[in-house]
């Protein structure tokens, strides 16, 4: 949801005002509402971090309802992880989904999207580390604003072309800037029809992501299913890619976000 001109309080009133006027319940939010461009910035927690740490670091925002009643919105913090080479990675909102996904101890999960997240959790459900893969954004940039999109035609999903792209991506780690050009040459050489090129490019990028992100896993971790958290169509695509990589997968419950928010609110003592 896009909020225009910083009118966060008005949007909250429009969406929840009638309900809040008759319910004295806790208000909790997570995700980009707590970003630097959001309602109020909620500081990042350093990994490893779990529900109890998030519950102790909620950022509060005073809210005035249409009837004049005053409430408090609690915003969950995001997470940051510093890799061995010094670069930081961050997430906002995905941590809430991870905690709400009812993962087994010591799991790994993937949250597909514009900025796909791979995360590894500990024995108590805490997020140990994670990686961001800009797969969705790169697809959009290549398909809409680059030369790779010149031959593309939008059509219904072509999974055979997607699978072909995944297979190429899986065996091309370390050659990302080279192999994505195949989404043009495959069209020029007649290997893939214009209608199939978007799926072919998508497959290449997701294949590169799966190969790169899973490379660090040991044999024990690779033997466990990857939990996919997110929108159905994207998760199905990632499921296909994981299977082609020889990895088992499963879906999280659909209420991961709201369940995660409930767990944070409960740990913070906001629930009766």
Task: Give names to the regions the model predicted.
Residues 1-25, 34-37, 41, 150-151:
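N-terminal phosphate-binding loop and adjacent alpha-helix
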Residues 19-88:
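Short beta-strand-loop/turn "lid" adjacent to the catalytic site in phosphate-handling enzymes
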Residues 26-28, 107-111, 227-228:
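Short glycine-aspartate micro-motif
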Residues 4, 78-169:
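Glycine-rich phosphate-binding loop plus the immediately following alpha-helix
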